[in-house]
Amino acid sequence: MSIATEIIGVPETLDHFQSESYSPYHFFSSEQWAKFRADTPLTLTSDEVKRLRSMGDPIDLDEVRRIYLSLSRLLSAHVESSQMLFEQRNRFLSLSDVTKTPFVIGIAGSVAVGKSTTARILKELLGRWPSSPKVDLVTTDGFLHPNAVLQREKLMQRKGFPESYDTGAILRFLSAIKAGRPDVKAPSYSHLVYDVLPDEYKIVDRPDILIFEGINVLQSRDLPAGGKIVPMVSDFFDFSIYIDAAEDEIHNWYVTRFMRLRETAFRDPNSYFHRYASISDAEALEIAEDLWANINLKNLRQNILPTRPRADLILKKGKDHLIEQVALRKL
């Protein structure tokens, strides 16, 4: 099913998408999108793309050419427009010696859909613009509550759900970033030990661009009973991207990745999941299916997928894990 059909119920053909005046998005096939690259140079090598991609993600240099160079050009236009508005506002307010705050890009989407690959590719491409901007990447993993807290609150089976994150810490971090503060600390997370690393931080020092990646970064919040207005994480974004795919495809990618990890990371004795390395394939498959059905699928349906229409750009992947359709919000 197409993005447009799922979001607003319009017919499936691409030609019809683009004629629908009530759609909030422009829709493009990957071939159409690739043409917007114009003269944007390819600044990555094949070996670099292989290094940047996550396990099971087949992205290659051709995919970078087809999708990411046009996206890099689009983001360059948004950053440039933001800079122009900043300068005009300073003139309006008669301000001088004011430093522009970082342009923040949010990237959301399900587990196993390829958010991390997209974030890393964009970080490299954006950092190689002629203007040589300073680009930082932070994920929400470090803002999860420590396992000890999740266990105490009986939330280990809800890890990755909105309530498993220290949302206050996320908001304080992004507030500091947008205030232009130097040396802002982002907590670190280890996928090996499956936990936040105490007293370990990434220092974010006034980048030109910050990429903030996580499954629930577009999540909205209910208004508190007392009526006090609470900001949402996405309030701090200048541009947002949602990585999309059919539910069945994400399921397949998740299970395949889990089985591959048994042959790699899970074999490390320090791995939280080391116990899964020595069980049979049948047992491992059953565990992977259970984790998908009872945790990740529920999170996708209840919390992640409903945020998709809030994105400025939706990248829809096909069965081969490559992007086949792009939806860009109209201005």
Curated annotation (Swiss-Prot):
<keyword id="KW-0067">ATP-binding</keyword>
<dbReference type="InterPro" id="IPR027417">
    <property type="entry name" value="P-loop_NTPase"/>
</dbReference>
<dbReference type="GO" id="GO:0005737">
    <property type="term" value="C:cytoplasm"/>
</dbReference>
<comment type="pathway">
    <text>Cofactor biosynthesis; coenzyme A biosynthesis; CoA from (R)-pantothenate: step 1/5.</text>
</comment>
<dbReference type="GO" id="GO:0015937">
    <property type="term" value="P:coenzyme A biosynthetic process"/>
</dbReference>
<dbReference type="GO" id="GO:0005524">
    <property type="term" value="F:ATP binding"/>
</dbReference>
<comment type="similarity">
    <text>Belongs to the prokaryotic pantothenate kinase family.</text>
</comment>
<feature type="binding site">
    <location>
        <begin position="109"/>
        <end position="116"/>
    </location>
    <ligand>
        <name>ATP</name>
    </ligand>
</feature>
<dbReference type="InterPro" id="IPR006083">
    <property type="entry name" value="PRK/URK"/>
</dbReference>
<dbReference type="Pfam" id="PF00485">
    <property type="entry name" value="PRK"/>
</dbReference>
<keyword id="KW-0418">Kinase</keyword>
<protein>
    <recommendedName>
        <fullName>Pantothenate kinase</fullName>
        <ecNumber>2.7.1.33</ecNumber>
    </recommendedName>
</protein>
<keyword id="KW-0547">Nucleotide-binding</keyword>
<keyword id="KW-0808">Transferase</keyword>
<keyword id="KW-0963">Cytoplasm</keyword>
<dbReference type="GO" id="GO:0004594">
    <property type="term" value="F:pantothenate kinase activity"/>
</dbReference>
<keyword id="KW-0173">Coenzyme A biosynthesis</keyword>
<dbReference type="InterPro" id="IPR004566">
    <property type="entry name" value="PanK"/>
</dbReference>
